[in-house]
Amino acid sequence: VTEKKTWETFFDAHAPVYEENVFTKNTVREVDFLLEELSLQPGASILDVGCGTGRHSIELAKRGYDVTGLDLSSEMLARAADAASAAGVNVDWIHADATQFILPRKYNCAICLCEGSFGLLGQGEDPIDQPLSILCNISRSLKPQAMAVLTVLNAASMLRKHTNEDIAKGRFDPLTLVESSECPPREGLPAIAVRERAFVPTELLLLFRLAGMSVINMWGGTAGNWGRRSLDLDEIEIMVVARKIAEPLAPGGSE
């Protein structure tokens, strides 16, 4: 990664305070739920895309899984590596862009959670190509019939909070379901303009299909409240549970 991407700058800056966010406080319960959904064999290999400070990766490694954590932010990964050492577990940390990675091995499972790259658009990134590239790269990293769990922003919830004035002022684009906002400056860093993409369930079915994956379930996936319950209009995130059934139809990232 040569020039820093918008979200790389954002997460590098927020790495020191990331785990102060309230949504990071339910890791053990979230991993319990993931393992119920995934039915993995002991020691199975897991790829965590957009692993951040490694809270899910480390908890999975504590339970004996073979975990690789991939993230765009070197600062987040540095904190993840420190936390893994403190916990006495080994995780393979990889600094890479989720839209462009190719890995040398295949995994039993992949996770991409809590806005872990999917739909976090850099300036100029296409609102369809970005998530599709990530899905295809995840799919290529999976063994046949392997499972994937992603949480993505729920368009129904995003739509309900925006007005026509937001559209006129460029804060929300109803054609692409992209929300534009500015993160305030902190610790000498300038304000950072960010773009977040939300999704509707029908397009998720199509995107996953293009990536060679079949969607098994979609649940309400708001952080801190995961469970096998129907999606409603107020869920901040959708949890998608899918299985790899074919190689991706669409082109993925490059090295």
Pin down the residues of each PLM region.
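SAM-dependent methyltransferase
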Residues: 145-211
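Class I SAM-dependent methyltransferase "Motif I" SAM/SAH-binding loop
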Residues: 50-54
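A short acidic, Gly/Pro-enriched loop at the edge of an enzyme's catalytic core
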Residues: 102-109
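A short glycine-rich, Lys/Arg-flanked "PGG" loop and its adjoining helix->strand segment in the class I
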Residues: 129-144
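Conserved class I S-adenosyl-L-methionine
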Residues: 1-44
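C-terminal lobe and adjacent flexible extensions of AdoMet/dcAdoMet transferase-like proteins
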Residues: 203, 207-255
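Class I SAM-dependent methyltransferase SAM/SAH-binding core
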Residues: 57-100
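A conserved beta-strand element that flanks and buttresses the S-adenosyl-L-methionine
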Residues: 111-113
